[in-house]
Swiss-Prot record:
Residues 95-105, 175-198, 250-271, 334-364, 438-441, 504-514 are vacuolar. The keyword Membrane applies. Keywords: Membrane, Transmembrane, Transmembrane helix, Transport, Vacuole. GO terms for biological process: gamma-aminobutyric acid transport; putrescine transport; transmembrane transport. This is GABA-specific permease. It is a multi-pass membrane protein. InterPro entries: AA/rel_permease1 (IPR002293), Amino_acid_permease_CS (IPR004840). It is found in: Vacuole membrane. One of its GO terms (cellular component) is fungal-type vacuole membrane. Its main location: membrane. Required for high-affinity, high-specificity GABA transport. Also transports putrescine. GO terms for molecular function: gamma-aminobutyric acid transmembrane transporter activity; gamma-aminobutyric acid:proton symporter activity; putrescine transmembrane transporter activity. It comes from Saccharomyces cerevisiae (strain ATCC 204508 / S288c). It requires NPR (nitrogen permease reactivator protein) for its full activity.
Length: 571
């Protein structure tokens, strides 16, 4: 090599070093502006995030503000699976069917269909959020991102608390439903000669929570495979019901209920007016069953190609459960004893157990209730996984007590063991309400619904108002015309549901055993969360807290993102 070539190479290397040093000083001088932009519509300064232009999951997660700590083991099918598993159609319908029959067959059939349509609209909007900013924290992160400047921290903190407690209440309601199903199976084997007490139910419930805690502490790859098992288990039991129940009904009961009974028989078993009872009895089965699609969001940091797989998981799980659940209810109403009161007053304590017993006999009823209980267990394991990821993410941002311990991730298995333990302990404590009476148990169902709907609707309202100039769509987006129409319609439905779940099952003669304590517990939790933040937590919680250094950030996002951020800085 000639001397001139060596000199040219030396100069080229020196120029690159000089350029890199200059860029480093330039980036260092940007300070907090290194990764942020300022809203023009009142949302203040937030991270620059553009999912549509990100080239991989790690880059997008870095733009959001976090390093990759959990392993991405969930395929699109398994992301769908965690929501579909938690919805657990037949086990969930079994748990809420008694309340739905309070308005007669037509209320249950059409209430499900109408409510599920609006739930799909809510899910579509959440899918847009998840496609734009896929992070395990989800709801409280989005709230902080779009909320007005000066209110970001307290509102996002309240939403984080609401979502965490609602998911924990969801664990309680699912596991309590499992306890009831196991008790119903035992009662069937003893021909009704078994006393089910609140103490026995809590014992079964607590045992289930402990077993689920152990099961969900395995590596994320095993948890992902569990979702595949749950998909096939739920589909198997549904197909079995579609085949066996009509055959048994025709053989043992001589035929089916006609279309007028299934689609037109309305029977108000409360003292509310017919319209309100239709909403109370008809909407709640679908709202509670198809109510865990945000679990896909909480798996965002374990999902492959999250900006696409999470939206697909949300929308597909809702759509499948909408139609498949509706067909299940039609099948059950075709086969049910026309004397609804005899089903609701079943000595087995479970309306579905009585329907199966009437059509198929004792052995089939025991087998079905055992299979339903198994699927309900898979539901519980899946929602325990989801709530642990929400608890972990919120603790990562110092949102919970003992956050410095809860946010730890095991380096070998990439699993947040302490978050799983915290979620299960919280569920056991909330579950103590079941020892009081049925009204307190019902409050757990209502708390899960109200808390989640508040958490789901809040970031949407802010995205459409104060943060409208910050929203950068991901791969899934309805467009500028349809997106806000769908979003506002979903918000209106969610506000209606929050109000609806606060009402008791009857209008007059309310006693302590018929009172709906959700109207006290829900708002009480939200108010206490705000007070707790003002008095203590504001010293530690400042919204989503990045765990990336500036060097890690610039390396992860690349020069193009840095150039875009710098070009958007105000002079």
């Amino acid at each position: 090599m000639s001397m001139s070539s060596k000199n040219e190479n030396k100069i080229s290397v020196e120029q690159r070093i000089s350029t890199d040093i200059g860029q480093a000083y330039q980036l260092q001088g940007l300070g907090s502006n290194l990764r942020s932009i300022r809203s023009k519509t009142g949302a203040g300064e937030v991270n620059y995030i553009d999912a549509a232009k990100s080239v991989n999951d790690n880059q997008l997660l870095a733009e959001i503000g976090y390093k990759q700590e959990l392993k991405r083991q969930f395929s699109t099918l398994q992301v769908f699976g965690i929501a579909f598993s938690i919805m657990g159609l037949l086990p969930s319908i079994a748990s809420v069917m008694g309340g739905g029959l309070g308005g007669g067959p037509a209320t249950l059939v059409w209430g499900w269909f109408v409510a599920a349509f609006f739930i799909l609209l809510v899910g579509i909007t959440m899918a847009e959020h998840a496609s734009s900013i896929p992070t395990a924290g989800g709801l409280y992160y989005w709230t902080y991102y779009y909320a007005p400047e000066g209110y970001k921290e307290i509102i996002s903190f309240i939403i984080g608390c609401s979502n965490s407690l609602a998911l924990a209440a969801g664990v309680c309601s699912i596991d309590y439903g499992l306890a009831e199903e196991i008790a119903a199976a035992v009662t069937l084997t003893k021909d009704g000669n078994f006393e089910v007490t609140s103490g026995k139910l809590y014992g079964i419930f607590a045992g289930a929570v402990v077993v689920m805690c152990i099961c969900t502490c395995v590596a994320s790859g095993a948890i992902a495979r569990l979702q595949t098992l749950s998909i096939f288990a739920n589909l198997f039991i549904i197909v079995l019901l579609f085949i066996a129940l009509p055959i048994g009904t025709k053989h043992r009961m001589g035929g089916f209920n006609d279309g007028d009974f299934i689609f037109g028989k309305y029977e108000n078993l409360s003292d509310w007016n017919n319209g309100w009872q239709f909403c109370l009895a008809g909407f709640m089965p679908a709202v509670w069953t198809i109510g865990s699609f945000d679990s896909c969001v909480h798996q965002s940091e374990e999902a492959k190609d999250a900006k696409k797989s999470v939206p697909i998981g949300i929308i597909s799980s809702i759509a499948v459960c909408w139609i498949l659940g509706w067909l299940i209810i039609i099948c059950l109403m075709a086969c049910i004893n026309p004397d609804i009161d005899s089903v609701l007053d079943s000595k087995y304590g479970f309306a579905l157990a009585q329907i199966i017993y009437d059509s198929l006999g004792k052995k089939w009823a025991i087998a079905f209730m055992s299979l339903i209980a198994f699927c309900q267990f898979l539901m519980g394991a899946s929602i325990t996984t989801a709530v642990s990821r929400q608890v972990w993410a919120f603790s990562r941002d110092n949102g919970l007590p003992l956050s410095k311990y809860i946010k730890r991730v095991d380096s070998k298995y990439s699993v947040p063991f302490f978050a799983i333990l915290a979620a299960c302990v919280g569920s056991l404590i909330l579950g103590l309400l079941c020892l009081i009476d049925d009204a307190a148990t019902d409050a757990l169902f209502s708390l899960a619904v109200a808390g989640n709907n508040l958490a789901w609707s809040t970031p949407t309202v802010f995205r459409l108002t104060s943060g409208r100039d910050l929203f950068r769509p991901g791969p899934f987006y309805l467009g500028k015309i349809w997106s806000p129409i769908v979003a506002w319609t979903g918000v209106a439905f969610q506000l209606f549901i929050i109000i609806l779940v606060m009402f008791p099952s009857q209008q007059h003669g309310i006693t302590k055993s018929t009172m709906n304590y959700a109207c006290v517990i829900g708002p009480g939790i939200w108010i206490l969360a705000g007070i707790y933040y003002k008095v203590y937590k504001k010293k530690y919680y400042h919204g989503p807290a990045t765990n990336l250094s500036d060097d890690d950030y610039t390396e992860a996002v690349g020069a193009d993102v840095i150039d875009t951020i710098m070009s958007k800085q105000e002079p």
